[in-house]
Amino acid sequence: MEPPGGSLGPGRGTRDKKKGRSPDELPSAGGDGGKSKKFTLKRLMADELERFTSMRIKKEKEKPNSAHRNSSASYGDDPTAQSLQDVSDEQVLVLFEQMLLDMNLNEEKQQPLREKDIIIKREMVSQYLYTSKAGMSQKESSKSAMMYIQELRSGLRDMPLLSCLESLRVSLNNNPVSWVQTFGAEGLASLLDILKRLHDEKEETAGSYDSRNKHEIIRCLKAFMNNKFGIKTMLETEEGILLLVRAMDPAVPNMMIDAAKLLSALCILPQPEDMNERVLEAMTERAEMDEVERFQPLLDGLKSGTTIALKVGCLQLINALITPAEELDFRVHIRSELMRLGLHQVLQDLREIENEDMRVQLNVFDEQGEEDSYDLKGRLDDIRMEMDDFNEVFQILLNTVKDSKAEPHFLSILQHLLLVRNDYEARPQYYKLIEECISQIVLHKNGADPDFKCRHLQIEIEGLIDQMIDKTKVEKSEAKAAELEKKLDSELTARHELQVEMKKMESDFEQKLQDLQGEKDALHSEKQQIATEKQDLEAEVSQLTGEVAKLTKELEDAKKEMASLSAAAITVPPSVPSRAPVPPAPPLPGDSGTIIPPPPAPGDSTTPPPPPPPPPPPPPLPGGVCISSPPSLPGGTAISPPPPLSGDATIPPPPPLPEGVGIPSPSSLPGGTAIPPPPPLPGSARIPPPPPPLPGSAGIPPPPPPLPGEAGMPPPPPPLPGGPGIPPPPPFPGGPGIPPPPPGMGMPPPPPFGFGVPAAPVLPFGLTPKKLYKPEVQLRRPNWSKLVAEDLSQDCFWTKVKEDRFENNELFAKLTLTFSAQTKTSKAKKDQEGGEEKKSVQKKKVKELKVLDSKTAQNLSIFLGSFRMPYQEIKNVILEVNEAVLTESMIQNLIKQMPEPEQLKMLSELKDEYDDLAESEQFGVVMGTVPRLRPRLNAILFKLQFSEQVENIKPEIVSVTAACEELRKSESFSNLLEITLLVGNYMNAGSRNAGAFGFNISFLCKLRDTKSTDQKMTLLHFLAELCENDYPDVLKFPDELAHVEKASRVSAENLQKNLDQMKKQISDVERDVQNFPAATDEKDKFVEKMTSFVKDAQEQYNKLRMMHSNMETLYKELGEYFLFDPKKLSVEEFFMDLHNFRNMFLQAVKENQKRRETEEKMRRAKLAKEKAEKERLEKQQKREQLIDMNAEGDETGVMDSLLEALQSGAAFRRKRGPRQANRKAGCAVTSLLASELTKDDAMAAVPAKVSKNSETFPTILEEAKELVGRAS
């Protein structure tokens, strides 16, 4: 049957018009077809194409054998080839493109053919035209597209319909795209009508033709959709996808396999978007029609008993439905719905199948599920970062479940949480276990909801329980650590006590050693002096002995002479000669030089000659140095002269001086000098004059002060006010001269030679002037209290600082960038107000009283009612000082509620009326018999409170002592002060506070007052970040200053008051014990127990006093070290400043970390957004590589390519970046993105790090601007 031409399509009409025309007319027809019409050409055979292109085409077995019969034609016999010689190259290229289109080749296979030479292209077109003509001449062996349409509309059934569909499938596979286009939407509609009719009809037998016909229609649809035209036409139909979904019947496995593959291919199409959602809608509609779950057919196809190919096809469709979705919630929802239907159990069975295609699909499913699970955990991290307010999170949860089926379950969860056992240690364990369970339920590792229909929910809690056990062990270890810390504190206290005792013992021993050493030195000097005196006396005795012997001999000679003279006088008559005076004896050794005149002879009337003048004083040494007279012997005794000789003999005077030599007066000598005294006699006590100074010596030491009674040189007159002082004496001959006096003695140094301007002052202690910085711009200036060189001392901290070692250009550039602006910020102040609570006391009526007033009796009755003991037993407990019964509160209440002594005395007189008295007065009668009750109670109270007072005072002393030692020893804190000094001097450049040698420690708390340019950072935050990045060792100083916090709570004034109060109380108790009357009751142990207590308390107090003294000494030394006045700055204020700074520094570190996390989060969000967009474009491009539905032309083999990509898994590979290396369950917020995220964008955004030497301010400024831009 010949179909009409002209109305069925351009290809068919052209072929009908060319019917009966000769081959000579083909070129013109070809030319016209290239312009306005299109040839309907038959496909070339593979062996003929190979002759030109060396390319083979798949599926040769499906090609008709008639082509082989026509392939033997030679090119020389082809009249078309001869006629093409006259066709232009442009027309040949047009025919060539039409040939490629009719050959049903895709773009990849067309490209090599286009690269051929024009001669080869002309031959290919010629041969193609010839074979097409030969095929058209065989109308009896083939049907046209319209014939198939008419047959499909004729109502064929069963076997005839099956034969027609099989023939149609072959034609759709073998004919060119133009034939498919001719079949077009009309033919497709006919196929879909038959398929719908078959779906609606119920099969009576399993092997009926309906199932085979439906399967053959699906195969025809697959062939029809193997090109872009067919896919577009199929997608334009309303029920095409639904009919494919209805064809997924596990009872017909082969048909379900083909239908699932077609639907999978449609799901991954790039255009139109959301094709997977259209397929899901069709599956939902089919489920509503059949009243089953929409994924139930897929689950039935995956269950055991089906073929592996069906299982692979169903799992492939599941992957195709989930993977293309962009929204995480959508993917998790689909996967969760499948899990609820039992996919989890089915997957376990599928994993046991050894099949490569199955393994590919399982890997795709698992990988996508794991990635979605990581995305969920990443979302949890974002929730933890952004939603940290309890009320806000609860309100959001309540709004999500309100008025829904989940609301009662949410309420039940909250109610169950109220049943958690209220135990301090157990409650956190409960919540940790609940959190882990919820985490595993919500964040399932396969990225889906759990199977709610299954009774068994597998939650891995063994590891969590092990962690809880380990945590319990850790808590026990922490408790032990706390206990050990207490022991450490006690050991530290004991160490300080021992140190104080040791220092006291050392000082006592040193004092004793000094005393003994002084006594030893005194005895040694006395011994040496006695030895010297002994030697002098022995020499003197030996000399006197010699003189006595000599005089004795002279006396003997004189006696002999007198005897001879007497004998001569007897013989010679006497005469009266003039008697010459006997010369005086020479002075004895050791005498003062005064010559004792001899006694006058009897009868001599002449006056004895005057004694010689005393020897002149020794001449003064040059420079006014004089030698004092020798001191007398110890005890003020002098060497007594020898006894006078026996008889009337006199010692002759010394011989006269040489002639012409006289003793001039001191004033007559030039220069006022006196004649040097004669050398002393042997044994003289005078001190020899000092030797002259050696050449080059520094001078002669000043003379000792003159002894009392001696005449010495008068002191020089004091210098006039403002005068230059006493000029130095001239130098000795040959000597270098006497150096000028040191500074401060009133003599300014001489000006430099040739100039009158004074030189720069020399800094003390080896200090060097501080470097003066000149920033490029003016910075915000820290307002510190500057310390100048005159404020420093030799051993203070600021004389040893070397802040220059922290200096670098990068630091100054950051300072300039951060603190260049000058903006004023206001600081809000918050006032705290506290409320007062009032207590009301109810009053009770009491019985009539005789001595006590009602209020006193009432208070005493209340006290006695709370303390249930007989009155006599209370008395005995007080007498015995029984500390096992007595408590501090009891004694305090007794002292407070006890009646006055006068009232007790009056009550004691009413002891005969004891039974008639009220209970409070009965108690007063009993207690009135205790002697000195109130002092006794005060002493007992002090005894009970003494241990507590010691335990309160001692830790405070130890804390301050340890804090002082830690500050002196902390190297990291010293480095922080040096860095702060460097930064402050740089920022204060050009101001009055520049060039500081140090600063007041209190300035540390003011670091946060200096704001950055953008008001987002303070100087404290800058220093914290600087230390964190460049000097991490400085961050250890909070740990090194462990006792600063405790020391900040210590009030030195209160500590002193407590010690003074303790001393007073000990003295009062000691006085009371001494003045206490003798005990009249055998149970009275007050004196006995208090005596030993006073002794122990005194020892404890002395120890505390020494520790307190040591603490004050250390704090005073700390003040000298850091240059502050300990009297003006109390211990509490100083350590409170340090404690506040320590906390502020730690807070600044945390805030810097949080700021970096926020910046990182913003950067991650930006990168994630860019990455998501990039992934979307890459995904779109990859899917377009499979098929571009918007491109021009009719590409063929599309369905084959899609199915091949689905089978290999290439269609499912989402390039979303590795997450395992970057995200883990419960990961910290500060974790960075994967290296893939930062490889492209972050490396381009963040400039490369340059060396510190080459880093300049503009580079830092650019980085900061870029950082601010990314943050905003």
UniProtKB/Swiss-Prot annotation:
Modified residue Phosphothreonine is at which positions? 768
* FH2 domain ranges (all copies): 769-1171
Q: Where is the composition biased (Polar residues)?
A: 67-84
Q: From start to end residue, where is composition biased (Gly residues)?
A: 1-12
Query: Signal sequence: where?
Result: none
* Phosphoserine PTM positions: 7, 22, 36, 1251, 1254
Compartments annotated for it: namely: Cell membrane; Cell projection, Ruffle membrane; Cytoplasm, Cytoskeleton; Cytoplasm, Cytoskeleton, Microtubule organizing center, Centrosome
User: Which BP terms from GO are recorded?
Assistant: actin cytoskeleton organization; actin filament polymerization; cellular response to histamine; cytoskeleton organization; protein localization to microtubule; regulation of cell shape; regulation of cytoskeleton organization; regulation of microtubule-based process
UniProtKB keywords: Acetylation, Actin-binding, Cell membrane, Cell projection, Coiled coil, Cytoplasm, Cytoskeleton, Deafness, Disease variant, Epilepsy, Hearing, Membrane, Non-syndromic deafness, Nucleus, Phosphoprotein, Repeat
- Clinical disorder: Deafness, autosomal dominant 1, with or without thrombocytopenia: A form of non-syndromic sensorineural hearing loss. Sensorineural deafness results from damage to the neural receptors of the inner ear, the nerve pathways to the brain, or the area of the brain that receives sound information. Patients may have mild thrombocytopenia and enlarged platelets, although most of DFNA1 affected individuals do not have significant bleeding tendencies.
Q: What is this protein called?
A: Protein diaphanous homolog 1
Lineage here is:
Eukaryota, Metazoa, Chordata, Craniata, Vertebrata
